[in-house]
Amino acid sequence: MSAQKPGLHPRNRHHSRYDLATLCQVNPELRQFLTLTPAGEQSVDFANPLAVKALNKALLAHFYAVANWDIPDGFLCPPVPGRADYIHHLADLLAEASGTIPANASILDIGVGANCIYPLIGVHEYGWRFTGSETSSQALSSAQAIISANPGLNRAIRLRRQKESGAIFNGIIHKNEQYDATLCNPPFHDSAAAARAGSERKRRNLGLNKDDALNFGGQQQELWCEGGEVAFIKKMIEESKGFAKQVMWFTSLVSRGENLPPLYRALTDVGAVKVVKKEMAQGQKQSRFIAWTFMNDEQRRRFVNRQR
């Protein structure tokens, strides 16, 4: 097991404060959502979901050449810098086999979401090809609309509906397909009540009353599942064994550090050859992802150099 110290990734484009003047030029809608902090500095009204969406539109257009992006009301509006960090750390993980980041990597995004955020960043930053899976037909339609509205993305991103209840890789990874890595932002609550309580905590932390608009929306499949994050990732680990020769690295975000021990035990049980934990940080927010493989060093080198 190896670990690496936290911090925003060096290649992340979002180290400095947002250049709001430039972002407002990119997306003039953002201007109406600017506010002043108690210190008198200009900021974005992060408690307003329309403001967060307008900021994301500007960031994706300015930094990632995604000119047309939108999501339906009620779906998660992800913070772009944190999502980019996962992609950059994943790139480093893929580079360890050959010493360079593969330019033609094939990545599977489990739960691509209405926002399609990971493929959008990964295609722009590294030229990777993505397959995105999703259980929700509405989320899939939204992601496809984003792909279709931006020239070139149709060649780089394809979407698949997960029709098998409770399945993660089964039904999505086809017989002769190979992926350099999978990624996933799993549902972290174990019930709708727990998800609501989480939103209440965020609301209180922002000093909002319960009627105020929130940017922490999300559909059921985005926020919770039976047994929560640990059960979901354990299921992923269990299924991954069946695709040990088709996928080099399986990865998943883990929202809470205390969830790691049962996941490590599950990885030992399925015979993972190597397990890696990557720590990430954005401001005060700490996050991490775990990665596991069933291939040894030599097998991973051969996998990276395979015919594509």
UniProtKB/Swiss-Prot annotation:
Annotated function: Specifically methylates the adenine in position 1618 of 23S rRNA.
Listed PANTHER family: RNA N6-ADENOSINE-METHYLTRANSFERASE METTL16, SAM-DEPENDENT METHYLTRANSFERASE
Subcellular location: Cytoplasm
GO molecular function, one term: 23S rRNA (adenine(1618)-N(6))-methyltransferase activity
EC number: 2.1.1.181
Descriptive protein name: Ribosomal RNA large subunit methyltransferase F
One cellular component term from this protein's GO annotations in UniProt: cytoplasm
Gene3D superfamilies: Vaccinia Virus protein VP39
Family: Belongs to the methyltransferase superfamily. METTL16/RlmF family.
Organism in which the protein naturally occurs: Escherichia coli O1:K1 / APEC
One of the GO biological process terms: rRNA base methylation
InterPro entries linked: METTL16/RlmF, rRNA_lsu_MeTfrase_F, SAM-dependent_MTases_sf
Keyword rRNA processing included in the entry's annotation: yes
The keyword Methyltransferase is assigned to this record: yes
Keywords: Cytoplasm, Methyltransferase, rRNA processing, S-adenosyl-L-methionine, Transferase
